[in-house]
Amino acid sequence: MIGGGSWATAIIKMLSNNIREKEIFWWMRNMDAIEHIKKYHHNPNYLSAAEVNIPAANISDNICEIIHAANYIILNVPAAFLKDTLKAVNPEDFKGKKIVSAIKGIVPDENQIIAEFLHEKFAVPFEDILVISGPCHAEEVALEKLSYITIASIDVEAATYFASLLNTRYLKTNVSDDIFGTEYAAVLKNIYAVASGICHGVGYGDNFQAVLISNAIREINRFVDAVHPISRDIKESAYLGDLLVTAYSQFSRNRTFGNMIGKGYTVKSAQLEMNMIAEGYYAASCMHVINKKYKVDMPISRAVYAVLYEKHAPQMEMALLTEKLS
C-alpha cells in the first residue's frame, strides 16, 4: 500500500480480513504516523477507530523497499502528489508486478489518468494495471456499512483474484475490463460533485440537483464513449453509483469544496479550511485541456472550470448553466 490516508487505511482494513497481516506492506511518508501505527495499531490521522495489525517491520517510509516486497502495488495518494511520491521509483521496480490504482483523480500537468501515466512514464503494460472504483466512501467501510466496489483490468483473471482479497461481509466486489471508462468516470464525477456543491452553496434545491446529476451522467457517457468506445452500461455502480454518492454524500470532500465555493470562499481559503484534497479541483483543469482534443459537449464540466479557474461568479455561472440542461 502506497499512501497513508483514509482510503488507504480502509483498504488495509479490508485486506487484513482475507490475508495474513505479515503479507501486507505499507508505505507512508509521515514518520510520526508510522511509529504510532506500530505501537498502537491504528492510524492517528485517518479512520483512527479502524484497527490495523500489520507487523511493525512491514510499515516503512522507504517506498522502494515496500515495492520490492510485494507483488501487488496499490497506489493510494492524491493524484496531484503521485509524481512526487514515485520520484525515487524506476520502471524496473514495477516490472512483473500488478499495479493497482485506488486514485480517483488525474495527474496534473500530465493531464493523464493513472493508467496512462503508469504506462507512459513507467512502461507498465496496460494488462498489469488494475483500477479500484465505485460508490465507496472510506468512512463507511471503516464503520463496516455494506458497500460495493469495482475492480477493473484488461486482465480479468487478475482483477477477479484481487477482488477476492477485498471481499468481506460488508464489502461486495464486481469485476470489469473497462479501465479507461472506469477511470475517466471516476475523474469526472469529482467535477460534478463540485458542481453539486456549488449549486447547493448558491441556493439551488433538491429538484435542481436531480436535473444536474441526470445531465452529469449523460456528460460522462458522452465523454467515455468518445475516448474509449466499447460496450458499457453507464448505469452500473462504477459509473452512475459513484457519481451519485460523490454528489450527494455528507462524506464527499468534492461536494463540500464546491459548497464552500458557492458560499463565497476563494479556492485557496476553501482548501485551507478543508485540509484535504478535493480531486475535482485539479480534474476540472485537466479535463478542460483533454476535451480540447475530443470536443465533447460538457456544459457542467465547463461551468465548474469557469468558476474555479476563470473566476466567474458562482451564482451567475450556475444561472447560465440552467439554460443548457434538460
Regions found by a protein language model. Give the residues of each.
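Internal alpha-helical scaffold of NAD(P)-dependent oxidoreductase catalytic cores
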Residues: 81, 92, 120-128, 146-233
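Alpha-helix C-terminal capping/helix-to-coil transition sites in glycosyltransferase folds
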Residues: 68-69, 188, 240
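Rossmann-like NAD(P)(H) cofactor-binding subdomain of soluble oxidoreductases
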Residues: 54, 58-68, 72-144, 162-164
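NAD(P)-dependent Rossmann-like dehydrogenase/reductase catalytic/cofactor-binding core
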Residues: 196-200, 225-326
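Generic structural signal for well-ordered, non-membrane alpha-helical segments
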Residues: 4, 8, 30, 82, ...
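NAD(P)+-binding Rossmann beta1-loop-alpha1 motif at the extreme N-terminus of oxidoreductases
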Residues: 1-50, 56-61
